[in-house]
């Protein structure tokens, strides 16, 4: 396995625009190396007979019929506003002229 050097960590952190202190560079190098070793183990698994999936549990849309219903709640909701002008809420002006 290729050894992750301190220079590699510095380069990646610079590309990612992350500030890493010198005391943490070696720690991150070791962690990245462990991650790459784990990925190498995963690459050895035979997945030829396993179909590709996007998720572990299949998701199904639950649909219902649309029911047209007369509803006149607009006026009731507008009546709850502290200030109303016709079919609109009236709010204080926030932009200066």
UniProtKB/Swiss-Prot annotation:
Q: Give GO terms: molecular function aspect only.
A: asparaginyl-tRNA synthase (glutamine-hydrolyzing) activity; ATP binding; glutaminyl-tRNA synthase (glutamine-hydrolyzing) activity
User: Quick check: keyword DNA-binding in the entry?
Assistant: no
Q: Which reaction does it catalyse?
A: L-glutamyl-tRNA(Gln) + L-glutamine + ATP + H2O = L-glutaminyl-tRNA(Gln) + L-glutamate + ADP + phosphate + H(+); L-aspartyl-tRNA(Asn) + L-glutamine + ATP + H2O = L-asparaginyl-tRNA(Asn) + L-glutamate + ADP + phosphate + 2 H(+)
Kindly list the cysteine pairs connected by disulfide bridges: none
Choose any GO biological process term that the UniProt entry carries and state it.
translation
Sections of the chain in a coiled coil: none
Q: State which Enzyme Commission number(s) the record gives.
A: 6.3.5.-
Q: Does the keyword ATP-binding apply?
A: yes
Source domain of life: Bacteria
Q: Tell me, what's a Pfam family for it?
A: GatC
Keyword annotations of the record? ATP-binding, Ligase, Nucleotide-binding, Protein biosynthesis
Family (UniProt) = Belongs to the GatC family.
Q: What is the stated purpose of this protein?
A: Allows the formation of correctly charged Asn-tRNA(Asn) or Gln-tRNA(Gln) through the transamidation of misacylated Asp-tRNA(Asn) or Glu-tRNA(Gln) in organisms which lack either or both of asparaginyl-tRNA or glutaminyl-tRNA synthetases. The reaction takes place in the presence of glutamine and ATP through an activated phospho-Asp-tRNA(Asn) or phospho-Glu-tRNA(Gln).
- Describe, as the record does, how this protein assembles with itself and its partners: Heterotrimer of A, B and C subunits.
Protein name as catalogued: Aspartyl/glutamyl-tRNA(Asn/Gln) amidotransferase subunit C
What is the species of this protein? Answer: Prochlorococcus marinus (strain SARG / CCMP1375 / SS120)
Q: Which gene encodes it?
A: gatC
